[in-house]
């Protein structure tokens, strides 16, 4: 008995085929290194998923997974045989719950599970008062504040330090021993330099990332909402 085709409505972002290919290249590069539990499915592996050219499965621990579907040959009745789009959803492992998610929310979920903001070396640099940096996965911070800015490590350290002064020093030594860091100097040393540099001005931040390193597999880039880095996005939804 032939299976009947079922039509569903999905939230999608219209992009070019070249845009999808570049994003796939980024994902495959990271899948060879740190994202080995991500799964890539070709169109013939997606079963009865009509118009699906490929699919990515991104596990999020025991909660569920993010499913990224890449579509092709959409709206053939209008002659758009080369039209591509992407859709992002979250599903639990029991397949009893599924919901569409926006690229910024998906980036936030992926960031929390796979990409820590700062390495141990970056934290040591901040303690010494050196000027460091930003989280390399900026897209995962869109939900953190109104402007989507990523807080610098110095700003976060200064916030913790001021909270420590406000709440009292005794709490620092309760419960467990504190790891000492060498070369901190006096109170006018590393912390003092950091306060002078960051305490009298507003937090710095930017919605534009630095691309010196290999780009990370951001859903914002895939959906075209940050497509001007590649120049292939028309920013149209279907």
From Swiss-Prot:
Induction (free text): Expressed late during infection in a Rev-dependent manner.
Region (Disordered): 188-214
Entries under InterPro entries matching the protein: Vif (IPR000475)
A single cellular component GO annotation: host cell cytoplasm
One Pfam family of this chain: Vif
One GO term of the biological process aspect: viral life cycle
Motif window: HCCH motif: 111-146
Location relative to the cell: Host cytoplasm; Host cell membrane; Virion
Key words of the record: Host cell membrane, Host cytoplasm, Host membrane, Host-virus interaction, Membrane, Phosphoprotein, Ubl conjugation, Ubl conjugation pathway, Virion
Record note on modification: Processed in virion by the viral protease. Highly phosphorylated on serine and threonine residues.
Entry annotated with the keyword Phosphoprotein: yes
Membrane topology: Peripheral membrane protein
Binding partners and assembly: Homomultimer; in vitro and presumably in vivo. Interacts with viral Pr55Gag precursor and host APOBEC3G. The interaction between Vif and APOBEC3G is species-specific, which may play a role in restricting the replication of SIV to their host. Forms an E3 ligase complex by interacting with host CUL5 and elongin BC complex (ELOB and ELOC).
Function: Counteracts the innate antiviral activity of APOBEC3G. Forms a complex with host APOBEC3G thus preventing the entry of this lethally hypermutating enzyme into progeny virions. Functions as an adapter molecule, recruiting APOBEC3G to the ubiquitin-proteasome machinery. Targets APOBEC3G for degradation through the assembly with elongin BC complex, CUL5 and RBX1. Binds viral RNA and affects the stability of viral nucleoprotein core. May play a role in viral morphology.
Protein name as it appears in the record: Virion infectivity factor
Gene: vif
